[in-house]
Amino acid sequence: MKYFIDNKIGEPGGFGDVYDCHSELGDRYAIKMLKTDDENAVLRFQKEVRLTSRLNHPNVIRIIACDTEGENKYYIMPKYQCSIVQIIPMLYNNFDRQYNVITEILNGLIYLHEQGVLHRDLKPQNILYNSDTDIAISDLGFSRQIDSDSLRLTQYGDVFGTQRYISPEQAQNSENVDDKTDIFAFGKILEDIVTNFLQYPIPNDEIGYIIDKCTNPHANRRFASSRELKSMVDNVYQNMLKITSNDDISTSISLLEMGMMDFSDIENLALKLMSHAQEDSIEKFFLALSDDEYKQLEYK
């Protein structure tokens, strides 16, 4: 099968650039091309292709074709619309969409970890997006197989990663890390999603707890695994999304009118209403607030 290169996609990468391309049959793909002949970069690119080629999960990028030995080294992958960098602003305060996107990311991360793969460069730019239910973790160039005897290109003391998303232990030594380093990065990504890149406060204490636990500077105090992390995320978001029907909303507003809700419940209800409710329900909610409650919410 022949492939034809079209336009460059996004910003230049570290060792490779990504372009739109199409096959001789007219199908659209993306192609990542190595742009240097540096020996270490070539070895890392070849390792990325070998590792990615053996993975098979809808939330991890797949390789369709490749050439890592010729003069022009490349691999072909599915074409995605964008990374989640462009989508995150649209997710703010929309808990349904947040949960869908977060679930996709975590499913991919769980798969990588259970295959014994550390990503080590997880960030929004490396998470590709077609829809809220079609998301893939990409760019496994810095990934490593846990407990593998294969060639290791990271030497003791080497450091790589992106400043905001790199764990403290990886900032010291990128070789001596485990799956907790990816959990740290996910915590920062979750914070990006719920705050629109830190423009707004974290919406509630439960999400704040998850972020804090993911990003604890001590790796052994983070979630024990990405699967344990997902279980906590599921519990928190499913609880946040319970109030969706008009009957539930009416019941909650009635409790508020009777003074039977504490402020944390009021705050959570407000967030749920902003994501799910019709304008008349939101109006009833604000009319039911006392002056003090309104001022507290306004301050928040």
Where on the chain are the PLM-derived regions?
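AlphaC helix of the eukaryotic protein kinase fold
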Residues: K35, E39-R54
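Short beta-strand micro-motifs within the conserved protein kinase catalytic domain, predominantly
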Residues: R62-K73
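AlphaC helix of the protein kinase catalytic domain
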Residues: I84-N94
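Activation segment signature within eukaryotic-like protein kinase domains
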Residues: V101-I102
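Catalytic-loop of the protein kinase fold
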Residues: H113-N130
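Conserved activation segment of eukaryotic-like protein kinases, specifically the C-terminal portion
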Residues: L153-Q170
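Regulatory extensions appended to serine/threonine kinase catalytic cores
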Residues: L241-K300
